[in-house]
């Protein structure tokens, strides 16, 4: 009897260690699959991403003398950029974007379930409203937590993508590459310059990621059932719809933060995100908050792909169900 008790006691730490190792292994796979899917999809959508940023920030570029006249639309922006800078320039800033997006998306996917468990809401026990709110909160918290670590890369990506050949300096660019963005910004504005627009970014990421993950997790078990369960196209379309809705809802905040980013290194800066929004509304009208939103919707295809591919790979490799 004593022997059995001793054996049972001795086996307890082993079982605990095994459980811990399994959890760590799952966390690692979540991290890697989310990151790889994100990197591939963002590279595929890089030309759309750059066009979106050029249209969104064109007024700041004109004020700084880096753009001669406004773009007439998505198609004209594509054509003009390719003609003036070459087709390869449509991927300008993509390296910084991949470096930023890999840890951001990977951390979002990896920590999403952990944040969800922290809220501890169950649909059957706590009701649909609390369960839905928990999904929104967990998605938002995951996005906001990772933003702090990668914001400077997002800033660098934005500056590189909007670094069109100068309209006043014979085609000269402002930055020579990723490292040059950091060097020049830090020299002119200090660390603060790399984090300009961080405030509205935090609010925007909570709104976007909260809806992005929260609504997808909530709608998945309702929509993707019966013949649609495990269907790649259905999963892709659901992800695209969620991405589009989330992007439109948070787009004005995205415009404000990127317009603030564009003033680092410039003589005139916005005193706050509120002041930035006020000036855009007064000088350019409400429509300016949504400049580039059309390209952003097209870019949403990449986000939908990340969600659906992630689900399919997990289902194939680990048998994880919706």
Swiss-Prot record:
ADP binds at residues 100, 112, 257. It is a multi-pass membrane protein. Disulfide bonds: none annotated. Coiled coil: none annotated. Residues 257-262 are annotated as: Important for transport activity. GO terms for biological process: mitochondrial ADP transmembrane transport; mitochondrial ATP transmembrane transport. Solcar repeats lie at residues 25-118, 130-222, 230-316. PROSITE patterns: SOLCAR (PS50920). The matrix-open state (m-state) is inhibited by the membrane-permeable bongkrekic acid (BKA). The cytoplasmic-open state (c-state) is inhibited by the membrane-impermeable toxic inhibitor carboxyatractyloside (CATR). A motif (Nucleotide carrier signature motif) lies at residues 257-262. SUPFAM superfamilies: Mitochondrial carrier (SSF103506). It is found in: Mitochondrion inner membrane. It comes from the Eukaryota. GO terms for cellular component: mitochondrial inner membrane; mitochondrion. It catalyses: ADP(in) + ATP(out) = ADP(out) + ATP(in). GO terms for molecular function: ATP:ADP antiporter activity. The chain crosses the membrane at residues 27-54, 95-119, 128-148, 198-219, 233-253, 293-313. Monomer. Belongs to the mitochondrial carrier (TC 2.A.29) family. ADP:ATP antiporter that mediates import of ADP into the mitochondrial matrix for ATP synthesis, and export of ATP out to fuel the cell. Cycles between the cytoplasmic-open state (c-state) and the matrix-open state (m-state): operates by the alternating access mechanism with a single substrate-binding site intermittently exposed to either the cytosolic (c-state) or matrix (m-state) side of the inner mitochondrial membrane. The transmembrane helices are not perpendicular to the plane of the membrane, but cross the membrane at an angle. Odd-numbered transmembrane helices exhibit a sharp kink, due to the presence of a conserved proline residue. This is ADP,ATP carrier protein. It comes from Schizosaccharomyces pombe (strain 972 / ATCC 24843) (Fission yeast). The lineage of its organism: Eukaryota, Fungi, Dikarya, Ascomycota, Taphrinomycotina.
